[in-house]
Amino acid sequence: MLAESVLGNLKEGGSSKELDFIDLEWFDAQKRMGRFTSQKGAELVLKLKNPPKMGLCDGDILFEDATSLIAINIIPTPTLHVYADSTAQVARLCYEVGNRHASLYYGDSPLSFKTPFERPLQVLFDKLALRYEVLKSKLDASQRISVSAPHADPLQEGSAPLKFKSALDLQIVIKK
């Protein structure tokens, strides 16, 4: 079977069709091409023409016929669940995690976040006195916090670099 686009997501509504899943690690959700075997043994070739910018999400439907669906299942992985007590802690957390180029995801409650487990981050959270716990959970691309902009491909015809305009109401405040 060939999957060239994401057909929807299981979260959008129920289906009476037989469900089958392709298990993916969170870091493989960015793939746009590959050959996978589903939990029930079906072979699927993934060749996305317009892949989602944030990657494949848990529940994304890649194949559908009259009787069955094949969707993505993001495998739970060890994660650090971090709980901030203030917006200042959120800013510090985002700065430190971003400075280490680690992935950061929204948590299940306000001011909570998830990141893949890494011992150096655990040590950092201890130093910053952030509350955290190590749990297994799904790191779903739909919950990923990203500030990355798409890069221009200089070899691709018609590709142009991003252009930024300064806002008329831009203010820079320097506190001493």
UniProtKB/Swiss-Prot annotation:
Biological process according to GO: protein folding; protein-containing complex assembly; urea metabolic process
Domain of life: Bacteria
Keywords associated with the record: Chaperone, Cytoplasm, Nickel, Nickel insertion
Localization per Swiss-Prot or TrEMBL: Cytoplasm
Cross-referenced InterPro entries: UreE (IPR012406), UreE_C_dom (IPR007864), UreE_N (IPR004029), UreE_N_sf (IPR036118)
Presence of keyword Chaperone: yes
Primary localisation category: cytoplasm
Cross-referenced CDD domains: UreE
GO terms assigned for molecular function: nickel cation binding; unfolded protein binding
GO cellular component, one term: cytoplasm
HAMAP family: UreE
Family, per entry: Belongs to the UreE family.
Role played: Involved in urease metallocenter assembly. Binds nickel. Probably functions as a nickel donor during metallocenter assembly.
Identification of the protein by name: Urease accessory protein UreE
Organism: Helicobacter bizzozeronii
Taxonomic placement: Bacteria, Pseudomonadati, Campylobacterota, Epsilonproteobacteria, Campylobacterales
